[in-house]
């Protein structure tokens, strides 16, 4: 028996929600270990549709949810999400949800700075959601963050807000934005504290007890490897480490507890917002993929950019993310296409290169090298066994395995939870 860590292997929106939901039914605890409420996913359980941004997916399956220290939490957004899913009949209480006492908090000032800086960038925007995630992580690294445990100590909160506002109000004033008062932030946090503090726990200890008891832990990543602050397409990335190694750091367990690493990838590529995208399609095919795949962001509602599967980037994600196997999603979106292309390499200034460059200037000049494969006419939609797949679809999956140097462990053939082909059980050693 093994733990499982789920991460995105592209730029996010790969269908992690469905896969995590499928795995959560077999886990005992589901842990969020990085990110904030800037990414979301939709889960369909019976007649109910849940849209989650902060809450661990396992809650919809009656499993304990844990928010680790690597997450940044907007307490107001958290409580709003709890209220929303509770109104749908889902139990979210201190019995079912625990939050690390040392988790950094997102305050209204963080969102204000996020939006003011993005506006000041003009046409050089990063593509932030404006929800304060980046500034909250900056405060954590700069050692001025307000953490969940601080809400229990008003005297600590008082002087920490002084230190925080000394920095942030200077920035806001320089950007021509409205500044904040300590009294306003103190009142904001004091009002939220009684509802949030009951969820506080020593999460590293809780998870260690679970490990010793042999309980199955599912670590749920947000965003994806190519949005990792170190290994992604910097600076068009998120503000945290999204690779599997951070499941340990972001929850307080040892690295050996990460277990089987399952990378999620679509059978094609998408990206939201700004940043390089070598295999992006600007033609009718790109629009076709977007329409068939219903490619709109769960949180932002922004249409996603679409393109062919980029095997080079996914192979990089496999290597730096420590991926043991892939879950390939949305294969059915490719049904009926006469031919399918896969990016198998890059060209930079007339020379073939082995990997995607780190320099933004070089990234902008990269051109994809494609391999063309025959499509299939029969549908893969709803297939639940390998034998149900068209021969060309099987060839496509096998070719992806060869190119990314990782086996396809799970195959998703529709948004429905049970339309999943299992080749290997990630929870079994």
Swiss-Prot record:
BP GO terms, sorted: 'de novo' AMP biosynthetic process; IMP metabolic process
Keyword Metal-binding: yes
Cofactor note: Binds 1 Mg(2+) ion per subunit.
MF terms (GO), sorted A to Z: adenylosuccinate synthase activity; GTP binding; magnesium ion binding
Catalysed reactions, as listed in the record: IMP + L-aspartate + GTP = N(6)-(1,2-dicarboxyethyl)-AMP + GDP + phosphate + 2 H(+)
UniProt: substrate binding residues: 298-304
Gene Ontology CC: cytoplasm
Protein name from the UniProt record: Adenylosuccinate synthetase
Classification via InterPro entries: Adenylosuccin_syn_GTP-bd (IPR018220), Adenylosuccin_syn_Lys_AS (IPR033128), Adenylosuccinate_synth_dom1 (IPR042109), Adenylosuccinate_synth_dom2 (IPR042110), Adenylosuccinate_synth_dom3 (IPR042111), Adenylosuccinate_synthetase (IPR001114), P-loop_NTPase (IPR027417)
Subunit structure: Homodimer.
Subcellular location: Cytoplasm
Keywords per UniProt: Cytoplasm, GTP-binding, Ligase, Magnesium, Metal-binding, Nucleotide-binding, Purine biosynthesis
Taxonomy of the source species: Bacteria, Pseudomonadati, Pseudomonadota, Alphaproteobacteria, Acetobacterales
Entry binding sites for GTP: 12-18, 40-42, 304, 330-332, 412-414
Family: Belongs to the adenylosuccinate synthetase family.
EC number: 6.3.4.4
HAMAP family, A to Z: Adenylosucc_synth (MF_00011)
Organism: Gluconacetobacter diazotrophicus (strain ATCC 49037 / DSM 5601 / CCUG 37298 / CIP 103539 / LMG 7603 / PAl5)
Gene responsible for this protein: purA
Function text: Plays an important role in the de novo pathway of purine nucleotide biosynthesis. Catalyzes the first committed step in the biosynthesis of AMP from IMP.
Active-site feature positions: 13 (proton acceptor), 41 (proton donor)
Pathway(s) the chain acts in: Purine metabolism; AMP biosynthesis via de novo pathway; AMP from IMP: step 1/2
Residues given in the record as Mg(2+) binding sites: 13, 40
